Amino acid sequence: NDLNDTYSLLGGAQAWIEFQSKKLDLSRWSRQTILPEVGMDGQKKILNATVAIVGMGGLGCPAGQSLITAGVGKLILIDGDIVELSNLHRQPLHGADDIGKRKVISAKESLEKINSVTAIKIVEDYLDEQNGLDIIRNCDIVIDATDNIDARQLIDRFSKETNVPMIYG
């Protein structure tokens, strides 16, 4: 059909520019939208998803990279830790210039360079009894990328209370 790219000029040039920018945005993920398991409907779900990553270290960094390149609409990064020299060989979102900086700030800066469309919220603290339930209840998925059992059990409990699926590594 030759009319697939036809667009009404109702709204003028501004509407056309907005239409074109959205069209270009979706082309970014064209390699995954051609997969029958994803398609355009699946990509729209990904673009509308909110994912929390608890821990921005050795598991959280690659998880964040994968999610942002897939086109997740909103990421919430939670970690109270600071980047140290010993982190750099296994946490690819942090560089030598980030030593002493909060991991969530460093990760956000790196992820925004990969995809500036995804909204990224940071929580410069560890997930705990006071903040955890409010953070997780507003997510579609929570990823446990922590390195201790107490945090994992807390995330698991909040996940069950809010019916938000938890993924852990």
Outline where the language-model segments fall.
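Adenine nucleotide-associated cytosolic modules
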Residues: D2-D5, A13-G169
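Glycine-rich beta-alpha loop elements in corrinoid/cobalamin-binding modules
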Residues: L9
